[in-house]
Amino acid sequence: MTKRPVGVIGATGMVGQRFLTLLAEHPYFEVTALAASARSAGKTYKEAVGNRWKLDIPMPEKFADMTVIDAANIDEMKKLCNVVFCAVDMKKEDIRALEEAYAKAEIPVVSNNSAHRWTPDVPMVIPEINDAHLAVIADQRKRLGTKRGFIAVKPNCSIQSYVPMLTALLEFEPYEVVATTYQAISGAGKTFNEWPEMIDNVIPYIGGEEEKSEQEPLRVWGKVENGQIVKATSPVITTQCIRVPVTNGHTAAVFVKFRKNPTKEQILKAWKEFSGKPQALKLPHAPEQFITYFEEDNRPQAHLDRDIYGGMGVTAGRLREDSVYDWKFVGLSHNTLRGAAGGAVLIAELLHKEGYFD
């Protein structure tokens, strides 16, 4: 099978680096173009990254000597690839314009950015949960005047630590959710070397994160109506998002009230059996088991459990009845794999299999 030529925009940043490690030996995709800011353009990838390689695995050799292109040079990118992954660090309105320009140039965009998460006809997808939202792509193409180009996005990294578990329990009608997230420093694109003030420290604020963590799940659970996604109205979610001194892995402590209160056995069965289109299609980055539950009192732990199924599975533990709410549990996801680049690659695998890139 001939691999599809793809590009990575924002290739020099942490999420861009993660994209390249995931795509280096991909069965469907071949990275043929790397793009970044104008100041990196013309340099080799190795030169452009310099001493800013942020991952604990080495830079794939095959990309080191590739020449970086200016992300704004869409004509040049179009000669080299026909799908792009986007992880640029720019102002939101600039990202919105850039992604739309690529889509209008008939290059589908799979984005890690938040700029288009609330554009009504742009699907914001966790592939196991709301693949049905891909149906709005036809309407988006009409709006953009494209035959092939479109934008698909993934949601915020924080919500992957509790939304899968809540989705598996929607039949029991959760109506009130409290979630406190404990978020790794890589969520800010940083390492301890770059952010020494996070060592031995907790910062009780992450700008914009609580609004995303409360509202984005409702869009994921929304319905497609008249060519756009209409968000769900329930459950009500309130969150606090806290930065903690962990390299990777977002943890969530969650409390839930249900209209049809399930038993512990029903909850555990729902989590164990929950799977979606990626598992049915056996997509390359689909975890065999989407939600893994640990019986041990001291799990899940970021250090031990974030890399389950290559960082694409999510884990849960400490499921207990609660004296104020009905149930409480702890969830964990890998924020730069399932929550960022890995989640976007899984979306692209699904789009590829379903014919959206043809």
Residue ranges of predicted features:
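Charged docking surfaces used in two-component/phosphorelay signaling
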Residues: 186-358
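N-terminal Rossmann-like NAD(P) cofactor-binding subdomain of oxidoreductases
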Residues: 1-205, 235-236, 308, 314-315, ...
